[in-house]
Amino acid sequence: MQARRLRNPKKTIDMATIYDYKALASNGKEIDFADFKGKVLLIINTASKCGFTPQFDGLEALNEKYRDRGLVCIGFPCNQFKEQDPGSDGEIEEFCRLNYGVTFQIMKKIDVNGPEAHPIFEYLKQQAPAEEYLGLKAKGAAALFKTISTSVEKPSDIKWNFTKFLISRDGTEIKRYAPTTEPKDFEKDIEAML
């Protein structure tokens, strides 16, 4: 079941920062990203039945280690890549908590690419387009992934589950990490932003 996405009054390209967006938590509560000003954000598109799902362990380790210093981790479940997150919002959140001890915020399931892509991910893709993936330039990676996922259309599109975005305290710096990048591999970037 596709979650309702919130509509912002402005188009994505007119948005100034990540703080102009809102999204729904898995319990249906509206989360206003303006509340995260002054925090370092780690936003991840997740899936519970993916080969990268064990990354929840590393993501939770970062969450536990740095949350008191200002890191906020937010997982957005997505079922666009080989339907690897088919459960309901409640089932997905329960899976994350029971199997990986996840304590960070899990949102309602969304699309990250295509006409129904959540505005937050449209903004993130615009601000931090992928330069390469698996050694391929973004255009080549998009062509490769289009063969396994119909949601990959543009070079900036999310290529797979567990693409990660790290956003600085003032929202002006956004770094993008490929699904193959383990959480421990960008810990230094988190420390630098904190």
Where would I find each of the regions flagged by the language model?
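Conserved helix-turn-beta segment immediately C-terminal to the redox Cys motif
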Residues: 39-40, 48-49, 53-77, 96-100
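Thiol/selenol-based redox catalytic cores and closely related redox-interacting motifs
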Residues: 95-97, 101-181
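Short, Lys/Arg-enriched N-terminal segments with co-localized hydrophobic residues
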Residues: 4-14
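Thiol-based oxidoreductase modules, predominantly thioredoxin-like and allied folds used
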Residues: 67-88, 103-114
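A short beta-strand-turn-helix
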Residues: 21-40, 61-66
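Non-catalytic, surface beta->alpha helical segment in thiol-disulfide oxidoreductase systems
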Residues: 174-194
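Short loop/turn microsegments at loop-to-beta-strand junctions
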Residues: 18-19, 41, 161-163
